[in-house]
From Swiss-Prot:
Domain Radical SAM core: start-end pairs: 100-339
The reaction(s) this protein catalyses: adenosine(2503) in 23S rRNA + 2 reduced [2Fe-2S]-[ferredoxin] + 2 S-adenosyl-L-methionine = 2-methyladenosine(2503) in 23S rRNA + 5'-deoxyadenosine + L-methionine + 2 oxidized [2Fe-2S]-[ferredoxin] + S-adenosyl-L-homocysteine; adenosine(37) in tRNA + 2 reduced [2Fe-2S]-[ferredoxin] + 2 S-adenosyl-L-methionine = 2-methyladenosine(37) in tRNA + 5'-deoxyadenosine + L-methionine + 2 oxidized [2Fe-2S]-[ferredoxin] + S-adenosyl-L-homocysteine
GO biological process: rRNA base methylation; tRNA methylation
Any Gene Ontology CC annotation: cytoplasm
Amino acids binding S-adenosyl-L-methionine: G168, E169, S200, S222, L223, H224, N301
Protein name stated in the entry: Dual-specificity RNA methyltransferase RlmN
Family affiliation: Belongs to the radical SAM superfamily. RlmN family.
Further details from the record: Reaction proceeds by a ping-pong mechanism involving intermediate methylation of a conserved cysteine residue.
Gene field: rlmN
NCBIfam families: PRK11194.1 (NF008396), rRNA_mod_RlmN (TIGR00048)
Assigned EC number: 2.1.1.192
Source species: Vibrio atlanticus (strain LGP32)
Length: 380
C-alpha cells in the first residue's frame, strides 16, 4: 500500500522542526532551510533547493510534497482587484487580491462555505462543507504570490496585508487558524507584521478567548447591529453569544494585544431600512462607548436572491456623521471588485453543502416563503 505523502505546507515552524527531527531523522536547521525555500522563494520542487544535500532531497521527494490550492478560475476587475477560485479537492474557495498603491491585501478563506447563517452574506447561503487545512489556508497566500509574481528584481512584496475575511468563520477553525497565522508572521514564513494580519470574527467568543492566549494579530469584529434583537435576526450566532458577551471577550483580547494598539475595528454592514436608521447609529455609539474602537461602515453589496438593498448615499452619509458626532473614527469601506462579485459578502466558491441549507433555501423560495423578508432557516 502506498503511503500518502506529507504536505509540508501543513506545518508551522515548530511542527516542521519536529517532523524533521522525529520522522526524517534530520537536524532541525534543515527544516528551516526548507521553510525559506518554500515561503521566501516560492519553491515547490525539492530538486531546486540547492543548499540541501542530495540524500535529504531524495528523502523529501519520497516522503513529502509541497501542494497549495490551484487556481481553477481567475476574474479581473476594472479596479485591479483579482478574484481567484482556488481548488481544494473537489470544491473551490475564493481568494481576493486587492491592490491599492503600495499596499496589496489578500482576502483569505478559512472554510469551504460557512457554518454560520448571517442573512446578508452570500457565502452563508452556500451552506458548509468543512474547515480548510493549514496547507489550504496558507496555500492561498503562497499561490497568490506565485500568480502575481514574487517580484524578486524590485524587492517589493506581492502581498503586504492578509485579512481573514474570505469564506467561513475563522474562529470555528482554531486548530488550523493558529498555525496558519504563525506562518504568516514567522520570519521564515511570509514574514508579515502582526499589524498587517487581520482576523475578522462574527462573535465566536470561545475562539477569541483562545486567540487571546495564543496569538497577537489585528482584530476586526462583524457586529452589524446595535442591539441583541436585531443582531439575532440577521446573525443567529448572537443567540449563542450575545453582544455583551462578545464585547467583553473583545476587550480582553485588545487589552493583551500589541497589534491592535488598544482599539478594535468594528465592521458594520449597512442594510437599507434594516440597521441604518439614525437611531441605530446613536444606539451603536452608546453600545461601543466602553470598547475602544474605530468603525468601518460597509454598504451592502447585493447578490442574486438577496432580500436586502444597499442604502442611498445620503443615508450612509447621515449614519457616518451621526457616529462622528460621538467622536468615533468612522470610515466607509470603498467597494472593490463588485463587478466580479469579489466585494465583501459576495464570495460563494463551489461548495458541497453538508448542512442541506441550500436545498432548504431553494424549497422555501419555490414555495414563495421568502417574498423579500428575512428568512429563518436552520441547518439540519
Amino acid at each position: 500500500m502506498t503511503t500518502a505523502k506529507v504536505n509540508l505546507l501543513d506545518f508551522d515552524r515548530k511542527g516542521l522542526r519536529k517532523f524533521f527531527t522525529e520522522e526524517l531523522n534530520e537536524k532541525a536547521f534543515r527544516a528551516e532551510q526548507v521553510m525559506k525555500w518554500i515561503y521566501h522563494f516560492g519553491v515547490d520542487d525539492f530538486e531546486q533547493m540547492n543548499n540541501i544535500n542530495k540524500k535529504l532531497r531524495e528523502k523529501l521527494l519520497h516522503r513529502c510534497e509541497i501542494v497549495a490550492p490551484i487556481v481553477s478560475e481567475a476574474q479581473h476587475s476594472a479596479d485591479g482587484t483579482i478574484k481567484w477560485a482556488m481548488s481544494v479537492g473537489d470544491q473551490d474557495v475564493e481568494t481576493v487580491y486587492i491592490p491599492d498603491g503600495d499596499r496589496a491585501t489578500l482576502c483569505v478563506s478559512s472554510q469551504v462555505g460557512c457554518a454560520l447563517e448571517c442573512k446578508f452574506c452570500s457565502t452563508a447561503q452556500q451552506g458548509f462543507n468543512r474547515n480548510l487545512k493549514v496547507s489550504e489556508i496558507v496555500g492561498q497566500i503562497w499561490r497568490a504570490a506565485r500568480e502575481i509574481g514574487l517580484e524578486k528584481e524590485t524587492g517589493r512584496r506581492p502581498i503586504t496585508n492578509v485579512v481573514m475575511m474570505g469564506m467561513g468563520e475563522p474562529l470555528l477553525n482554531m486548530k488550523n487558524l493558529i498555525p496558519s497565522l504563525e506562518l504568516m508572521l514567522d520570519d521564515l514564513g511570509f514574514s508579515l507584521s502582526k499589524r498587517r494580519v487581520t482576523v475578522s470574527t462574527s462573535g465566536v467568543v470561545s475562539g477569541l478567548d483562545q486567540m487571546t492566549d495564543n496569538i497577537d494579530v489585528a482584530l476586526a469584529i462583524s457586529l452589524h447591529a446595535p442591539n441583541d434583537a436585531l443582531r439575532s435576526q440577521i446573525m443567529p450566532i448572537n443567540d449563542r453569544w450575545d453582544i455583551q458577551d462578545f464585547l467583553a471577550s473583545v476587550r480582553r483580547y485588545i487589552a493583551s494585544s500589541n497589534a491592535n494598539r488598544g482599539k478594535v475595528t468594528v465592521e458594520y454592514v449597512l442594510l437599507d431600512h434594516v440597521n441604518d436608521d439614525m437611531d441605530h447609529a446613536r444606539e451603536l455609539a452608546e453600545l461601543m462607548k466602553d470598547t475602544p474602537c474605530k468603525i468601518n461602515l460597509i454598504p451592502f453589496n447585493p447578490y442574486p436572491g438577496s432580500p436586502y438593498k444597499k442604502p442611498s448615499n445620503s443615508r450612509i452619509d447621515r449614519f457616518q456623521k451621526t457616529l462622528m458626532e460621538y467622536n468615533y473614527t468612522v470610515t466607509v469601506r470603498k467597494t472593490r471588485g463588485d463587478d466580479i462579485d469579489a466585494a465583501c459578502g459576495q464570495l460563494v466558491g463551489d461548495v458541497i453543502d453538508r448542512t442541506k441549507r441550500t436545498k432548504m433555501l431553494k424549497a422555501a423560495s419555490e414555495a414563495n416563503l421568502i417574498a423579500g423578508d428575512v428568512i429563518q432557516v436552520k441547518a439540519v
